[in-house]
């Protein structure tokens, strides 16, 4: 069975609708919302063929259809229209990247923040190792009555996260109190300074939350000592929680587990060192933890030499054309800004 123009239009419509709504798509929906010029019955026949070709599939609990990983791949390779950033987005990028950022780490974190902000996905980047790392902040995000995600950020942009067990009696307000106190007393300190001066004080102040405090300090230690080699930058962690796919706690744990394994992330991001945009969809990713996700990455360069990689991680139900446009633009801007910065600093 061959793909023809009508099948392509039906597949395109299914993907557009599913990306937009996160709901399985039926033939009546396509007939009503997309002007394909054919009846729901004809669309049903085409959907049956698309399912036979492996391009769409039926979720267990629904009569509608959703794209398969193969369907997304066909869309990206054959149907996707290239997009560019709109004028306001371009102004935002150029304004942010033209700020007088002196440190490479600041430039990398700014880039990662922009990637996440412009796409609403989670942004990752690998950059040169510069400077001495200090603790910046910790945040807790309750995900179950007895579990919370703890996220630690360092001055280098390194981010560590773990799902922590918390006492059943501990409220979100209690978690907020812990994070505020840790941030107020530890921000800007190295791990040696943390150990030397403040652990006893914090232990006294947070007697009732000792279990959470102990695990938090372990996580801070990992973050401050996990930046050997290329530094790993991450932004848009909260965007993960907005995606319906990751309301499944197991999927969420798998993804968060990968994001905290910086060496694994380095390997995943270095799969394609050659120039250009690279897209890996679902099962194309070689690590189990990201097989429910898609990754859009590109390397940035200095005089033809690869400096590092930036990219996005999101559900396979991703706006690929938007993701590609943002990664392309920021790769170009980052290469230009780092060229000036690294030459001046002699790195």
UniProtKB/Swiss-Prot annotation:
Q: What is the lineage of its organism?
A: Bacteria, Bacillati, Bacillota, Clostridia, Eubacteriales
Q: What keyword terms does UniProt attach to this protein?
A: Repressor, Stress response, Transcription, Transcription regulation
PANTHER family documented for this protein: HEAT-INDUCIBLE TRANSCRIPTION REPRESSOR HRCA
Q: Which GO terms describe its biological process?
A: negative regulation of DNA-templated transcription
Q: Which HAMAP family match?
A: HrcA (MF_00081)
What is the originating organism of this protein?
Heliobacterium modesticaldum (strain ATCC 51547 / Ice1)
Its transmembrane ranges are none
- MF-aspect GO terms: DNA binding
What is this protein's function? Answer: Negative regulator of class I heat shock genes (grpE-dnaK-dnaJ and groELS operons). Prevents heat-shock induction of these operons.
| Family designation | Belongs to the HrcA family.
- Name of the protein this chain belongs to: Heat-inducible transcription repressor HrcA
Q: Which Pfam families match?
A: HrcA, HrcA_DNA-bdg
């Amino acid at each position: 069975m061959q793909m023809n123009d009508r099948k392509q239009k039906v597949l395109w419509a299914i993907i557009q609708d599913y990306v937009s709504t996160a709901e399985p798509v039926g033939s009546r929906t396509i007939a009503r919302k997309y002007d394909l010029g054919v009846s729901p019955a004809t669309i049903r026949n085409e959907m049956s063929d698309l399912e036979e070709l492996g391009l769409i599939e039926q979720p267990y609990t629904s009569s509608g259809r959703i794209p398969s990983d193969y369907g997304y791949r066909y869309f990206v390779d054959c149907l996707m229209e290239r997009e560019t950033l709109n004028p306001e987005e371009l102004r935002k990028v150029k304004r942010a990247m033209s700020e007088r950022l002196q440190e490479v780490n600041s430039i990398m974190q700014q880039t990662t923040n922009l990637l996440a902000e412009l796409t609403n996905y989670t942004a990752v980047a690998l950059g040169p190792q510069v400077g001495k790392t200090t603790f910046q902040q910790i945040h807790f995000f309750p995900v179950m009555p007895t579990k919370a995600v703890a996220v630690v950020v360092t001055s280098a942009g390194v981010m560590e996260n773990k799902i922590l067990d918390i006492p059943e009696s501990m409220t979100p307000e209690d978690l907020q109190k812990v994070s505020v106190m840790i941030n107020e007393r530890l921000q800007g300190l190295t791990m040696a300074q943390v150990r030397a001066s403040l652990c006893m004080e914090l232990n006294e102040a947070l007697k009732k939350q000792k279990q959470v405090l102990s695990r938090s300090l372990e996580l801070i230690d990992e973050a401050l000592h996990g930046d050997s080699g290329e530094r790993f930058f991450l932004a848009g962690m909260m965007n993960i929680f907005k995606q319906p796919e990751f309301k499944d706690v197991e999927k969420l744990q798998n993804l968060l587990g990968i994001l905290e394994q910086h060496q694994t992330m380095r390997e995943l991001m270095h799969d394609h060192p050659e120039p250009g945009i690279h897209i890996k969809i679902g099962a194309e990713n070689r690590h189990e933890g990201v097989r429910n996700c898609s990754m859009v990455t590109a390397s940035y360069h200095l005089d033809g030499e690869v400096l590092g990689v930036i990219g996005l991680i999101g559900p396979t139900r991703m706006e690929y054309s938007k993701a590609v446009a943002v990664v392309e633009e920021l790769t170009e801007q980052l290469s230009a800004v780092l060229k000036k910065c690294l030459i001046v600093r002699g790195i």
